[in-house]
Structures are given as C-alpha cells and as structure tokens.
Amino acid sequence: MSEIVIRHAETRDYEAIRQIHAQPEVYCNTLQVPHPSDHMWQERLADRPGIKQLVACIDGDVVGHLTIDVQQRPRRSHVADFGICVDSRWKNRGVASALMREMIEMCDNWLRVDRIELTVFVDNAPAIKVYKKYGFEIEGTGKKYALRNGEYVDAYYMARVK
C-alpha cells in the first residue's frame, strides 16, 4: 500500500470530503443527515477560529478527514473535540490511526490542548477500538443520544487527558 500523507485540508478538497461523508457507511456513524449540500461543505472547510481540518491522502486522493475544534471559551481553551471519518473503501488500512496520531501530536505539542473529547455511538466497535488504542477512555453514556435510521441510539462520551 502507498504511504498515507496527512495534510491540512484545502478548500479544493471539499468535493472529496463531501463524497466520503455521503457514503451510507460513513454518515450513519455521524450526526449528519443524508445528502449534504456542496455549499455546506464549502462553508465547513472555510477558515474559522479554533478549527483545524486534516485530510489523509493516498496517491493524492483524499481518503480520510478529521476536524479538530479547540474550544474558544477561556476556561475551556485547554479542550478540543474532534470528528473523524474514513472512506469506506479504505477502512482497516491505518487511515484512522494516521489521522489520530497527527491530531494528538498537534494537540499535545502545538495547540496547548490537555483534554481531547469525542462522542461515539455505542455500537461503533471499530471506532471505539481505535480511540482506546490512543488512550481515550469512556467517561459516560448519553441515552437516546441521536436519531439514526428511525431509531434512537446511545453514545459514549470519551476523552483523553494529557
């Protein structure tokens, strides 16, 4: 397999990112609804305070996306949360791990982030396994956290504290 290259997401990446998030295997594990608009993705990739966007590329193609949101409130400025997705054709090939390593490196050494938070549906075992691999722990459960395919699903609150 070719090398996984992690870089900052550019506006030109929005179509590839939109296509990844439009995959049913991907959006069912996010809070996104089906059929996101081009405009929404263009806005999401615009520069915003506290937001860092990374993409994973293989042979120049975007195969993964991670957004870091560093809290802007002074008393929570040491905290970030993130969302991650991987093209379903590239699952189980190290893409999520490469994005996670780079995100943790940025948070630990460049962004003064001591706590990284996330939510994950309780039935998303592959994602939970990756998060635990990088030191995230389950801190609680949100009952009926979100609606997915017509049914409520619970989510874990997880965090990694430096």
From Swiss-Prot:
Q: Does the keyword field hold Calcium?
A: no
Question: What PROSITE patterns is this protein classified in?
Answer: GNAT
Q: Which GO terms describe its molecular function?
A: acyltransferase activity, transferring groups other than amino-acyl groups; L-methionine N-acyltransferase activity; L-phenylalanine N-acetyltransferase activity; N-acetyltransferase activity
Enzyme nomenclature, EC number: 2.3.1.-, 2.3.1.53
PANTHER family found in the cross-reference section: N-ACETYLTRANSFERASE
Q: Which NCBIfam families match?
A: PRK10140.1 (NF007527)
The protein's name in its UniProt record? L-amino acid N-acetyltransferase AaaT
Its lineage reads: Bacteria, Pseudomonadati, Pseudomonadota, Gammaproteobacteria, Enterobacterales
